Structures are given as C-alpha cells and as structure tokens.
Amino acid sequence: MLLAGAIFILTIVLVIWQPKGLGIGWSATLGAVLALASGVIHIADIPVVWNIVWNATATFIAVIIISLLLDESGFFEWAALHVSRWGNGRGRLLFTYIVLLGAAVAALFANDGAALILTPIVIAMLLALGFSKSTTLAFVMAAGFISDTASLPLIVSNLVNIVSADFFKLGFTEYASVMVPVDIAAIIATLVMLHLFFRKDIPPTYELARLKEPAKAIKDPATFRTGWVVLLLLLVGFFVLEPMGIPVSAIAAVGAAVLFAVAKKGHGINTGKVLRGAPWQIVIFSLGMYLVIYGLRNAGLTDYLSDVLNELADKGLWAATLGTGFLTALLSSIMNNMPTVLIGALSIDGSTATGVIKEAMIYANVIGCDLGPKITPIGSLATLLWLHVLSQKNMTITWGYYFRTGIVMTLPVLFVTLAALALRLSVTL
C-alpha cells in the first residue's frame, strides 16, 4: 500500500508541477513504469486499463479537434457576440447569457473546450465594452465555473463522464435521461450563486454600439456552416448509432474528419496548427495514470473506499448519493479528478451496492468529479491550463482567491446537484 501510494503521489506531483515543461503524458508514463518495475501492477493489467481508457480518450480528442476547428472558423466568437446583443445593454442579462453560452458549449464541446476557448473570447469582448478589471474577472470566473458545473448532461461533455460511462457500460441515451435534468438543476444553482457572489461587480448597463457585428467574426464560412450540420448529425448519431454498438469515439471521429476536410479545403484555417493543438498526450496520460491507479486498487485502497460506500448504501438513496458525491468531490479537489473518477468507479464496483443505490453512486461519482475540481486549482488539468491562459492575458488569479471563491461557490451547487440526482432517481420517467 505504501509503495503504491508513494508512486501515485510522485506521479500526481509531476503531472501538476510539470517540471521543465515535462508533458503530463510522460509524467504518467514514468509513474506506470515505476509501478510495473516494482510489482505494484502486472503486465496483465495493461490491456485491462487500455480497455477502460481507449474510447474515452479517442472521443475527447475528436471533440476537442471539432471545437478547435469551429473556434478557428469564428463560430464561438459569433455566438458570444450574438448573446451579448441579446443582453440589450443590461449587465445582469449579459452575465446570465454568457453563463448559459458557457453551459451550452460545455455540454457539446466538453468542459475543456468551454473554458479554454470561451475565456479569451469573453476577455476580448469585455475589453471592447470597456469593463473594469473587477467586472472582467467576474465574467471570466463565471465562464470558468460554468464550464465544469454544466459538463454533466452528455457522455461527451467531460472526459470524466466518458470514463465512467465506459466502465459501467452506460448507453448515451440512458446516461442523458438521468443527467440532463440534473444538469439543468446544476445550471440554475450555478447562475444563482454566480449572481449572488459577483453582484457588486456586474455593471447595470453596457454599450451595444461598442460590439462588432457577429457576421464579421466568421473567418471561414464553409467550416462555420458545416459545423452546424456536423453538430446536428453528431447528436443524432450519439443517440441512434451508439445503442447499435458503434463506439462514441467512432461517431465523434467521423464528425471531426468531415469538418477537418472542409477546413483544409477552404485554406482559411491552419489545420496543421489545429492538429498540433489537439491534446494527444491525454492518451498516454490516461493509460499511464490509470495504470498507477490500478496499482492502488491492487494494493487494496479501493477496498477501504468500498467499505465506506457500503455503509452509505445501507443508509439509503439520499445518503448514498450525497455521501458518494461529496467524497469524490473532496478527493478530486485534493488529488485531481481524473484519478479520482477511476478510484471511485473501482470502489463502487467493489461494493455490495445494487439497483438504484448503485446507480446513484455511479452518477454521484461523476458529479463529484465534475464539480469537485472547482474547489482547488489542482482539481483538474483544465483549470491549471485555464489559469495559465489568463496569466498570458495579464489576468493573474491567485490560488488563494481561487480557493476562497471555489469553496463558497462549489459546495451549495454540489449539494443542489446531488439532491436533484436523488430526486431524479426517486421517480421513474
């Protein structure tokens, strides 16, 4: 147990710290090699772990490539400018619409896409409107927060969702039928908390005339138009083809390939830059990190957590839902959500929970790992990258400020979201 734990801690430190620019994939690989060399894991564990991660990572990469291509075409800036006009010069309405745009982008393009793509666009738009630094910070924090809290509804909305759905063999429609209503509750709770927390920083009015026409944001009309078609077909494909046994990754890959072909033909987008910007290291990272996690499982860590979950299960649906969600949220905030989701899944699988109680734990694990990372900067890799992007835009958010904001914002939203899950599973739709 001690050796497996030491290897895990070393791996997490390297992944978060990234000394001398060491990629997350290589840090995780080092951890996996150490685990294999020390006997913490075995050769036979590699295909088992690969079976857990391949579909998730392939889907994630395809979705991010689609989002990068659409970003280069001007799709997201066009959308942001439109919702800004819907605000009709009223600051609170603009704030609400930006948050709802972030929720929509997170649902369709994953939380990473929402945070990293929308943030620079929102900053540029707010600068054009002449907003103060405190107002800009409020909007940026809101965009970053909603990208995670609203990444629940679809399997493709978060890498955590894909990993968990693959592990427990959850179908796309089955997952969405539970989590779409839960996500709506999360969005409402997030909106309320954001308006309360940043109420003094949101201006009463803004000048619409300062914003450029949305049409001027479109840089590649062909890719822009094709993007709408691809998104529609992807959603249809996810709901129709996935139940037939076609992997979500294959459906997403076809969509990415079609959009990429259109973008390459148009010459308006540097497709090579897009490919280089795709998160290829996530494949190596997921395999390496999850091999390290499997070492913790082999050492018996997940057995301890299974015992805790068994006690929660004995207390009923609400205790199982809230207990699992808050436990995995805490673990995610301390040791990152990617390792936590697999630890949670293995622990749930090893518990004696059955029926709706086990189902509640599965979805609560996802919620905890999606929302928990908002408590601390190290909760997710996307947050660390997001903070880096902000620093490049001369917006430095200290870890202390992030934690103070995160803890106040996250806990109420997490409670409401988990309560919505318990209510959803209490009724048969």
UniProtKB/Swiss-Prot annotation:
Keywords from the UniProt entry: Arsenical resistance, Cell inner membrane, Cell membrane, Membrane, Plasmid, Transmembrane, Transmembrane helix
Chain segments annotated as transmembrane: 24-44, 46-66, 98-118, 121-141, 178-198, 228-248, 249-269, 274-294, 316-335, 407-427
GO cellular component term, pick one: plasma membrane
GO annotation terms (biological process): response to arsenic-containing substance
Keyword Coiled coil: no
Location of this chain's protein in the cell: Cell inner membrane
GO molecular function terms noted in the UniProt entry: antimonite secondary active transmembrane transporter activity; arsenite secondary active transmembrane transporter activity
The keyword Cell membrane is annotated on this UniProt entry: yes
Membrane topology of the entry: Multi-pass membrane protein
Cited function: Involved in arsenical resistance. Thought to form the channel of an arsenite pump.
Record protein name field: Arsenical pump membrane protein
Organism encoding this protein: Escherichia coli
Lineage of the species this protein comes from: Bacteria, Pseudomonadati, Pseudomonadota, Gammaproteobacteria, Enterobacterales
Gene encoding the protein: arsB
